């Protein structure tokens, strides 16, 4: 769902994400409180999920490839990553990254830095703008947003699996079961 321009103005003026008359649930159809927290995460999603599960979140890069654009002076990449916890993918993120500096370009080209980490390396808090969000037919949710600063601009679409807050750590096999 995309908010109307009036709703968006109310929701996101000065970082405000709810108001007395407008809510994320009403505008985007996102009703679970933890889903709403994830929808408004501004570059710290990996840390939020790691804290929730008390386990490391891995970012698995499917691809990160340059986009050739002869009409632009900026370097661009398209990326797809999967965020996993307990070896289970809970989010797939597709993004377009446009860099405006050599420092940001080197970090993106390295392929070792996630987008949230990129801003930390650059010591910059990006401007977060939620463009749209909503539930998926399968029971998960999605969001489209941008992270922007003078050195880099990221346009990101994330799709979260159903039951994203109910993932289970695989059961450890007991010593007795392994020895059989």
Where on the chain are the PLM-derived regions?
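Composition-driven recognition of glycine/serine/threonine/acidic- and proline-rich low-complexity segments
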Residues: 2-180
């Amino acid at each position: 769902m995309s908010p109307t321009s009036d709703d968006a103005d109310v929701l996101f003026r000065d970082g405000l994400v709810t108001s007395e008359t407008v809510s994320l649930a009403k505008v985007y159809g996102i009703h679970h409180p933890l889903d709403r927290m994830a929808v408004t995460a501004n570059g710290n999603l990996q840390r939020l999920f790691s804290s929730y599960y008390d386990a490391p979140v891995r970012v698995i890069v499917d691809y990160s490839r340059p986009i050739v654009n002869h009409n632009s002076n900026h370097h661009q990449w398209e990326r797809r990553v999967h965020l996993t916890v307990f070896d289970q993918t809970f989010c797939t993120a597709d993004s377009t990254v446009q860099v405006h500096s050599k420092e940001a370009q080197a970090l993106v080209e390295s392929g070792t830095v996630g987008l949230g980490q990129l801003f930390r390396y650059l010591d910059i808090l990006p401007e977060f703008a939620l463009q749209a969000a909503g539930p998926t037919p399968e029971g998960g949710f999605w969001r489209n947003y941008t992270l922007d600063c003078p050195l880099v601009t990221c346009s990101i679409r994330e799709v979260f699996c159903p039951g994203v807050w109910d993932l289970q750590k695989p059961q450890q096999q007991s010593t007795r079961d392994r020895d059989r």
